Amino acid sequence: MAEIESWRSKAVAQDVVYPDREHLGRVLGQLRELPGLVTDVEIDRLREQYARIADGQAFLLQCGDCAELFSYCNPKQIDAKLKLTLLMSLIVIYGARLPVVRVGRIAGQYAKPRSKPTEKVRVDGEEREVLSFRGDNVNGTGLEERTPNPDRLLSAYFHSAATLNYIRSRLASGLADLHAPRSWSFQHVRSEYLQHEFERIADSISDTLDFIRAVGAEPGGAQASNTLNTVDYFTSHEALMLEYETVLTRETPRGVYDLSAHTVWLGDRTRQLDGAHVEFFRRIRNPIGVKVGPSMKPDELVQLLDTLNPEAEKGRVTLISRYGARKITELLPAHIRAVRASRHADAVIWCCDPMHGNTVPSPGNPAVKTRLFSDIVTELAASLRIHAAEGSRLGGMHLELTGDDGVTECVGGSMELSDADLARKYQTHCDPRLNYEQSLDIAFLVSEVLRARRLGHPHSENDALVHVLARSTDPAAEGK
């Protein structure tokens, strides 16, 4: 296991400085003795499913909070995210006629990369410089909680364990029963066209499920298909905290696995070829993600793949593109061509993150971050189109969302939220997230695009859906 410590000889980007190193050592010793949060068997099952995604035989839906808080570890919020993910996956399955691999940004997504180690805040009318909030597993949001506290790593472990245990119990208890499309409400949809389209898709899904029951696959019956009642659901997070990841990495007869989550990803700030994070990632057998943004050079991307996946194992690396709606057309084709010209052409999974490149200040309050739904849809649609034009395949989408309805953090969508609505229910402590309704908008859009391509008319009815969703940021556009 000495090899898993090899990252210590490299530069650590986004490193956290703990004033009390002895305290940190004691906490890491405790964590080293605790069981892994997931198992190597579960991770290998996900590796098999990722290989099918790389072959075009499945679709990846990876979604959840930007950064979890410990307070999110409660039945209401876990249920909300879990139910939304299951609902979105059912909608995509209907259009794509492909299995959907569900991966949550949950049960460990506590750390938060920052561009600066400190930030300025106003206290009693005066501006003070304090340590930046780095996520609940590092420090707190209160000014008196900004010193990194090793005990928060233990709290992160136990909150992750409780969240994961609750998810497993809910799925085992029938939460994933897929027989509810007729109960879906589309009252939030202001566009008559979109409401009609969403209701049409829901009716079609209901008809399909009625057919399944009619041929003897009724849940609970002798011929029941287990897939109608239970599903696989995997966990993921950005592996920022290498000390934490290392003590939860274990050697088993199958190999070396990071048992903090089923899959982890490299952020745009920690993917240096000669850095500690890449060194750690290349040692573990988990499937891994790599954020690919505007600063990534095509040859650098191929070098990174050579380092992380020297055997070109199918599905081992997911490339999570995040350019921004105004840059994707310029940057994505070159990255696709570089990968297609390499030995990794058939091994990678391409996944679109239409969130991180589209964060902007609110016009009404520049201190508040938001995202325009039109930008999110534009980047996602462009990614689908560019991959098709380049002879590649978009294998999934990576979204920041909350299962809570009525949250107002992103502007637009079928609810036609305006900038003025942000103050109504803006709750994030990190980046703005899609709410329940906006998340369904995305699911319906992707489902329709994949359905049209499956039926051989990729530029027909889905164009109207993309157009209406993209312009729905501006309520005045309706009816033009």
Name what the model sees in each region:
Residues 50-53, 91-93, 280-281, 386-389:
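A general structural signal for short secondary-structure junctions and capping/turn motifs
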Residues 61-66, 103-106, 352-355, 400-402:
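Short loop/turn segments at strand-loop or loop-helix junctions that form parts
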Residues 1-8, 46-76, 294-306:
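Short N-terminal secondary-structure initiator segments
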Residues 56-59, 346-352:
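Short coil-to-beta-strand
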Residues 45-47, 274-277, 334-335:
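Glycine-rich, charged/polar anion/phosphate-binding loops
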Residues 310, 316-320, 325-349, 356-407:
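Non-transmembrane, aqueous-exposed alpha-helical and coiled segments at domain scale
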Residues 1-59:
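N-terminal basic/disordered segments at the start of proteins
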Residues 67-68, 72-324, 368-371, 379-380, ...:
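Active-site-facing alpha/beta catalytic cores
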